Regions:
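Short alpha-helix in the alpha/beta-hydrolase fold that links the catalytic acid
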Residues: 50, 64-74
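Short, conserved loop/helix-junction motifs that constitute active-site signature segments
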Residues: 46-48, 77-78
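Hydrolase active-site cap/lid region
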Residues: 1-34
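Short beta-strand/loop motif that positions the catalytic acidic residue
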Residues: 47-49, 54-60
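C-terminal catalytic histidine-bearing segment of alpha/beta-hydrolase fold enzymes
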Residues: 80-163
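Extracytoplasmic/secreted cell-surface and envelope-processing proteins
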Residues: 2-4, 62-65
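Active-site nucleophile elbow and catalytic-triad environment of alpha/beta-hydrolase enzymes
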Residues: 28-44, 50
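Acidic catalytic loop of the alpha/beta-hydrolase fold
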Residues: 58-63, 91-93
Length: 163
């Protein structure tokens, strides 16, 4: 169900004032999604015998691990073909860092620091040519280097699912 997640995000952005917006958010969601508005991921997962892999970082601050994530509803999931893969490795256990190697995350920190220095040098009005040079200097392969062990766990799930 989307409303708890929307409200959690809203609380982070607007604090308790988000509750004043609740009726309008609810109406918008209902008009946008119609009959499917009340469906939940748990209902969908339980309605099938299809293998399902649920991934989550235990320090995810975007989709709260213990609050609104699918994995927080683990005790409601009855599909016996569900597998859970929780990343608890420091720095890789957030929302957007699950798949990347620690080396990639270190490199991203380095290039972000360089980018911050460029921003500060130009007062956040960086000339296009400087931006072009900066982005051209980024090693796209290093930025996206995957954590092989984590990816192997995912591949194992898929290989088992198609047997």
């Amino acid at each position: 169900e989307a409303m708890p997640m929307i409200m959690e995000w809203g609380m982070g952005m607007a604090g308790p004032l988000i509750y004043l917006e609740y009726p309008f958010i609810w109406l918008n969601q209902k008009l946008t999604f119609g009959d499917t508005f009340g469906l939940t991921a748990v209902d969908a997962i339980n309605s099938t015998d299809t293998p399902v892999l649920i991934l989550h970082g235990d320090e995810d601050t975007t989709v709260g691990y213990d609050t609104v994530s699918i994995i927080s509803k683990k005790n409601e999931i009855t599909n016996p073909n569900v597998r859970y893969l929780v990343c608890d490795v420091d720095r890789r256990n957030g929302h957007n860092s699950l798949f990347y190697s620690l080396e990639a995350l270190d490199y991203v920190d380095e290039i972000n620091e360089i980018g911050s220095r460029i921003d500060e040098r130009y007062g956040y009005d960086v000339p296009e040519e400087v931006l072009r040079e900066y982005y051209a200097s980024v090693d796209k392969f290093r930025v996206r280097e995957l954590d092989r062990g984590f990816m192997e766990s995912i591949l194992t799930f898929y290989r088992d699912a198609v047997k």
